[in-house]
Amino acid sequence: MASLRIGMTTLDRLGFSAARGIERHLSARLGSRRTEGLETTAESLGILDALSPTEQDQLVATAIRDARTAPTRITQLAQAWHEGDAPKLDALLREGFKEFPQLRKRLIDDRNAAWLPKIRSLLKGSENAIVIVGSGHLAGPDSLVDLLAKEGVSLTQQEHTTRRTAPATP
C-alpha cells in the first residue's frame, strides 16, 4: 500500500485528483440512475495485498527510485490518452511495468478478462451503458478494446469535444 500512496501523492501534486475524476463527473450528471462497478474497491486493493512481501518491497523501492521521473511519465500518459494515441499509451504503460510483468498481468490483463462477462451482459441489456476504466485497460493486445473487438464488438474511439492540456511537469 505504501507504493500506492507514493503514486497517489505524485498524481495529486500534478493536479490529477480522484475528486475531479471522470467517475465523479459522470456520477453528478447521472443523478439517481443505476450505477455499478466491475469490481469492488476491496477486490482491486486485494491485488496489491496479494503481492508477496518481496514484491511489495520491490514496488515501494521502485516507486521511491522513480519519484523524480514520475511526473514526466504521468504527463506523457495523460497526453497520449487525451490524444487518443493507443499505441503510445500501450508503449508507455508497458515501459512502466517492465520490471513487474506479473503485476501488469494481475492489475491489467487478469482484470480485463474478469470484467468481460459483465461488460458483455451490459452490452446485451436494453439500457444504454457507460463503462469507465483506467486508461491502462484501453490499449494493447490484451486491452478491453482488443478483447471486445475479438468477440465482434464494434468499437469507435470518440473525439474529445474539449481539449484539456496535461498538467505541466513541475
Where are these regions (language model features)?
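Structured, acidic catalytic/metal-binding patches in enzyme active sites
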Residues: 1-103, 107
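C-terminal soluble interaction/assembly domains
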Residues: 105-170
